[in-house]
UniProtKB/Swiss-Prot annotation:
Chain segments annotated as transmembrane: 26-46, 70-90, 94-114, 134-154, 169-189, 197-217, 234-254, 261-281, 286-306, 335-355
UniProt entry keywords in alphabetical sequence: Cell cycle, Cell division, Cell inner membrane, Cell membrane, Cell shape, Cell wall biogenesis/degradation, Magnesium, Membrane, Metal-binding, Peptidoglycan synthesis, Transferase, Transmembrane, Transmembrane helix
GO MF term set: metal ion binding; phospho-N-acetylmuramoyl-pentapeptide-transferase activity; UDP-N-acetylmuramoyl-L-alanyl-D-glutamyl-meso-2,6-diaminopimelyl-D-alanyl-D-alanine:undecaprenyl-phosphate transferase activity
Annotated gene: mraY
Family: Belongs to the glycosyltransferase 4 family. MraY subfamily.
Cofactor(s), by name: Mg(2+)
Keyword Metal-binding attached: yes
Biological function: Catalyzes the initial step of the lipid cycle reactions in the biosynthesis of the cell wall peptidoglycan: transfers peptidoglycan precursor phospho-MurNAc-pentapeptide from UDP-MurNAc-pentapeptide onto the lipid carrier undecaprenyl phosphate, yielding undecaprenyl-pyrophosphoryl-MurNAc-pentapeptide, known as lipid I.
Name of this protein: Phospho-N-acetylmuramoyl-pentapeptide-transferase
Pfam family, one: Glycos_transf_4
């Protein structure tokens, strides 16, 4: 919005030429998101407490979690506001990729909102059935996939890190692949959201990493130099990623141990969906496995646990997702969180190294 209002005036006021630069707008989208979270956070937490929108705790979970019963949830609403508003303020709103990402982010957030609301209303931790949730997520992601496939400049090739010459053309099959990436990322972040600050930390790190990927993909000269896919218009997603970083930092202020508020599914599903969509658009889908390695391990731990129990009648972990396994081993919650953050930073650095290792 500000881009469209102020940049056209740059001939009369040369200082406004700065709105042309994605880096400037990404920085201020980050700051704007952070300020929105700081300002609205206390009000929202108080409102959620008054409405008794509290978290229900699994009865079979770690006993240390029982004290968290009733902590305000659905704090992801704050994250959504802090992402969407700065994005509308600072991005070029004629950019298709921005709207596709917002569609997934808000759409997944709406599914999460309904899920959280049902949990609170029914006073249990079940919410929407797995089938209902998956159906809606796949429908939204599928819509995004069709929109991208139908957009002529978008490429349906798949890029692999470390192998510059390996770029298979998926054609129409890119749509189900995009759905897999977007829905998979969303559910992986959702599974990670089990400890105070555990999910939002790696999300901030991943968002910052994809801010750089988006900027590079949108710059044809830099993309050619680094031998990565050039995606005209993808640079605007750097501004959206900046908003995600700011929103994440602002939310972490209230979500750090001991948490004053939980993001709920409205936050985790929308953040994961946004990351998956940005990975698809920037042609860094495979790299998401590295950047979001914490999310991948959390999701795999659940798959392994369920498969092992069904096939062998035994559980590999004391409890899944894997962060609960470490809790039951006696690790303090803050120790698990910070160590997972450290691993996430290392993985982000490895992912960034793929820009040169080709």
């Amino acid at each position: 919005m500000l881009y469209h209002l102020l940049y056209p005036l740059h001939e009369q006021f040369s200082v406004l030429y700065i709105f042309r630069y994605i880096t400037f707008r990404a920085i201020y989208a980050t700051i704007t998101a952070l300020m929105i979270a700081f300002i609205l956070g206390p009000w929202l937490i108080d409102k959620l407490s008054r409405l008794q929108i509290g978290q229900s705790i699994r009865k079979d979970g770690p006993q240390s979690h029982f004290k968290k019963e009733g902590t305000p949830t659905m704090g992801g609403t704050l994250i959504l506001l802090a992402i969407v508003l700065p994005t509308l303020l600072w991005t070029d709103l004629t950019n298709v990729y921005v709207w596709v990402t917002l569609l997934v982010t808000v759409g997944f957030g709406a599914v999460g909102f309904v899920d959280d609301y049902r949990k609170v209303k029914l006073r249990n931790s079940a919410g929407l059935s797995a089938r209902q949730k998956m159906l809606w997520l796949m429908l939204i992601a599928g819509t995004a996939g069709v929109m991208l496939y139908s957009y002529p400049p978008f490429q349906t090739t798949l890029a692999f890190p470390f192998f510059k010459g390996l770029r298979p053309e998926l054609g129409l099959f890119y749509i189900p692949f995009a759905v897999l990436v977007i829905v998979g990322a969303s559910n992986a972040v959702n599974l990670t959201d089990g400890l105070d600050g555990l999910a939002i930390g790696p999300t901030i790190i991943a968002s910052g990493t994809y801010l750089l990927f988006a900027y590079l993909a949108g710059n044809a000269r830099l993309a050619e130099y680094l031998q990565i896919s050039s995606v005209q218009g993808a640079g605007e997603l750097a501004v959206l990623c900046g908003a995600m970083v700011g929103a994440g930092l602002g939310f972490l202020w209230f979500n750090t141990y001991p948490a004053q508020v939980f993001m709920g599914d409205v936050g985790s599903l929308s953040l994961g969906g946004a990351l998956g969509t940005i990975a698809v658009i920037t042609k860094q889908e495979i790299v998401l496995v590295i950047v979001g390695g914490i999310f991948v391990v959390e999701a795999l731990s659940v798959i392994v646990q369920v498969s092992s129990f069904k096939l062998l009648g035994k559980r590999i972990f004391r409890m899944a997702p894997i962060h609960h396994h470490f809790e039951l081993k006696g690790w303090a919650e803050p120790k698990i969180i910070v160590r997972f953050w450290i691993i996430s930073i290392i993985l982000a650095l490895v992912a960034l190294s793929t820009l040169k290792l080709r």
